[in-house]
Amino acid sequence: MSALGGQARGGDGINWKGTSVGIFILLVAILITYAIEQSMIPQGLFGGLQGVALVFPLIGIIVGGALIGFGVHFVPVGGAPAAMGQAPGIATGVAMLAAGAGLAGLFGGAWAWTATGDFWITILGGGIGGGLMMAITCLMVNLTYVFAMGVPAASGKVNKDPITGYTFPEFKSQGTEGHGLPFISYIGGVMGGFLTALGGTLIYLELLLVYQPGLEQLLGSSAGSVEPLAVSLAGIFAIGFFLVNAVLSAYNITGTIEGPHDPKFKRVPRAIIGCAVASAVCGLVAILIVVAI
């Protein structure tokens, strides 16, 4: 059963009752953040932050979480069966592989922000970092499958590659669900790495833009003195957000997935909603870190 109350055994549909509750929670988180931004909550409870935007960063965090949930479903993951050449995909778990792409993206995005200070270049740089990491990973995986294990790339979900038109049945070994990384899975991996890293970098940058002025007010210090702390906190929370959304997506996938051509890809809307709700709640908590209590 999914986090949104989906059908048992990994059904593809959306449970609208659970989705309605999730959207309500998301809206409540946004309203609370708006109240803090406008200092509408009494000073005895929260002090508020003067002149610091909070609602738009939270919305950015929600969008980033949704991008992570969306991108994870592109990544070809085969788990233990793939390690034995009995299923297509990369021989690891969904969350671990997605987290690797996300960390690569965070490094790329952090470097781009330091070098340029431009918002769009930063999130694009993060996305490119994640996509490049997945491109190299998928290439080395296929080299290992073909030249070390001696198995060609063959999908078990479709009979023909949607991009190249190559057929798979004659290359698929008996008793397996396929093996290797077909071209569509390779492209899916690169797209998934780009989207997940894009979302993770967006979350990092939104948190950083809240923490830098927020810590200045909270600690009464200069911008230069709080910058290392702001960068550290934003990085820690961004990694945490990434893992939360990657694990939620992994539960939604329930096992292995070959990429965008896999029937499990139809579950994407459910993952996007779940990740958006989780990001809203976690984002509210992350923002409260710099609110005077």
Question: Which residue ranges define each predicted feature?
Answer:
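N-terminal signal-anchor module of multipass membrane proteins
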Residues: 1-79, 263-292
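Short, non-helical or kinked segments that cap or interrupt transmembrane helices
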Residues: 77-96, 214, 253-265, 269
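Alpha-helical transmembrane segments
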Residues: 49-57, 61, 119-138, 225-241
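Membrane-water interface at loop-to-transmembrane-helix junctions
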Residues: 8-22, 162-197, 221-231, 263-277
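C-terminal ends of transmembrane helices
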Residues: 5-6, 68-82, 137-146, 247-261
